[in-house]
Amino acid sequence: METKQSIPLLMPYKMGPFNLSHRVVLAPLTRSRSYGNIPQPNAKLYYTQRTTPGGLLISESCVVSETSLGYPDLPGLWNRDQVEAWKPIVDAVHSKGGIFFCQIWHGGRVFHQDQPNGEAPVSSTDKPLMCKNMYGGQFKPPRRLRSDELPAIVNDFRIAARNAIEAGFDGVEVHGAHGYLIDQFLKDKVNDRSDQYGGSLENRCRFALEVIEAVVNEIGSDRVGIRLSPFADYMESGDSNPEALGLYLVQAMNKHGMESSTVTWLNLE
């Protein structure tokens, strides 16, 4: 009969500075229960029910700005009320011995509700999604971001990471996967730009690497994870050569001093 010590999932693991008692992780799960984009008190029960001593939890996606919501009633980390609302939730997870990372995210053209002031969602492209949104309707055509707008979005990720640490989280996971904004720059079946953020692998990866670098510089590499999905085509985000894309990203992070020994984890799907 197998013992706990012989089951890899149940064995301890050192993840950067964090000592995990096992390798079962709560994945980030969208809940759409944060009314007004503020996490509600019921989130404390939700997360503590899933906490074990030394276990790793990754929060539901937290949006980095009011123009990045994607889905309705998602929690944010761009203002003071949101930071304060997260604090008792994170404290409750820590009181049970959990290690809690916050996933920070921008939906880009995957936007299921109206933007502030009725503006179009933003993306690497102006190509609309052809699939249906969660309400059975059509996605609104996105507005192609100008290159001079991208530093502000990079800064939104940086501020969200800083706010996550202030709220008490142990670190953040940058969501660069599944057809959302960062992935919309990475994948050549979405990104049709001809500037320094499109075309070559180097150019298509530029925005992702700028985000990662800004977040690492803000909170430290041992508090940062990155989720990537070079092989997935969710939300019409396929790539013609996913192996080359994934390899380039890993090598580029290594070149920037962001290899697996400095970024807490790299989740490739």
Curated annotation (Swiss-Prot):
Gene Ontology CC annotations of this record: nucleus
Taxonomy of the source species: Eukaryota, Viridiplantae, Streptophyta, Embryophyta, Tracheophyta
GO molecular function, one term: FMN binding
Chain sites annotated for binding FMN: P28, L29, T30, Q103, R227
Active-site residues, Swiss-Prot/TrEMBL: Y180 (proton donor)
Function, as annotated: Putative oxophytodienoate reductase that may be involved in the biosynthesis or metabolism of oxylipin signaling molecules.
Cofactor or coenzyme needed: FMN
EC number: 1.3.1.-
Residues that hold substrate according to the record: H175, G176, A177, H178
Protein name: Putative 12-oxophytodienoate reductase-like protein 2A
SUPFAM superfamilies tied to this protein: FMN-linked oxidoreductases
Family: Belongs to the NADH:flavin oxidoreductase/NADH oxidase family.
InterPro entries: Aldolase_TIM (IPR013785), OxRdtase_FMN_N (IPR001155), Oye-like (IPR045247)
Keyword set, alphabetical order: Flavoprotein, FMN, NADP, Oxidoreductase
Signal peptide: none
